[in-house]
């Protein structure tokens, strides 16, 4: 197995500040709801020896990478190969968590090493399932079977892609001739109809985002998990959520607003964003927003 870790922990300094604000620093439970390769976990466990980690990761391939990467801390870690919403529905721990971290970004390993078609930069099968055994439909299934109307709605609703209508029409026309099987095929279909003069990012970016969100049921999992995260948070515990696009950030923002200020306190009025230096070192961090609250 290649042990190179692709992922850089986003907003790590801000997360460490949250941990340092915990009133008690002894035998605390830290749940990483989206363990990935373990980049956040490694940095946190190295710095704070009073934390024990519960690491949740649905993708068995990346979970094995995390176990190797975090081997030095194996005595302080319990792993769960599960979706985070399933874990919290059936919360298996005897005590509530003192710190819950949720990084909703897709690991760079999925883009660069998984061969599952998350990125249009490589020519790969158009799959995008984090776990093939629990996700019944692939991205290829969606683009080859959904109606033009359903494709247009999916692409717009899950990415705010303004050219969703022409993209969905192009997909439907192309598949009359040939089934779309790979990332490069789909990218070529999108590029052919996208006005490049209007493109601030790669024309395929938002469509790929929408497909990934749909395949893995990301927004529904987030909505299901929000009340479960705070339910399983100990008194004075902190929930920290990192989002990477406006749709999921709005869901988190609205949920935090709905909570009683007598029971929960937002750590900051506005989301915490990466510094210029962090963005310079780690370009994917540029869209990250951290929202956090404390259970009173």
From Swiss-Prot:
EC number: 2.1.1.199
Binding of S-adenosyl-L-methionine, residues: 38-40, 57, 80, 103, 110
Entry's Gene Ontology cellular component terms: cytoplasm
Function: Specifically methylates the N4 position of cytidine in position 1402 (C1402) of 16S rRNA.
Compartments, record wording: Cytoplasm
GO molecular function: rRNA (cytosine-N4-)-methyltransferase activity
Leader sequence segment: none
Gene Ontology biological-process annotations: rRNA base methylation
Alphabetized SUPFAM superfamilies for the sequence: Putative methyltransferase TM0872, insert domain, S-adenosyl-L-methionine-dependent methyltransferases
Gene it is expressed from: rsmH
This protein's record includes keyword Cytoplasm: yes
HAMAP family associated with the record: 16SrRNA_methyltr_H (MF_01007)
Family indicated by similarity: Belongs to the methyltransferase superfamily. RsmH family.
Protein name per its UniProtKB record: Ribosomal RNA small subunit methyltransferase H
Catalysed reactions, as listed in the record: cytidine(1402) in 16S rRNA + S-adenosyl-L-methionine = N(4)-methylcytidine(1402) in 16S rRNA + S-adenosyl-L-homocysteine + H(+)
Enzyme's top EC category: transferase
Pfam family, one: Methyltransf_5
Record bears the keyword Transferase: yes
InterPro entries in UniProt: RsmH, SAM-dep_MeTrfase_MraW_recog, SAM-dependent_MTases_sf
Sorted UniProt keywords: Cytoplasm, Methyltransferase, rRNA processing, S-adenosyl-L-methionine, Transferase
Biological source species: Borrelia garinii subsp. bavariensis (strain ATCC BAA-2496 / DSM 23469 / PBi)
Chief subcellular location: cytoplasm
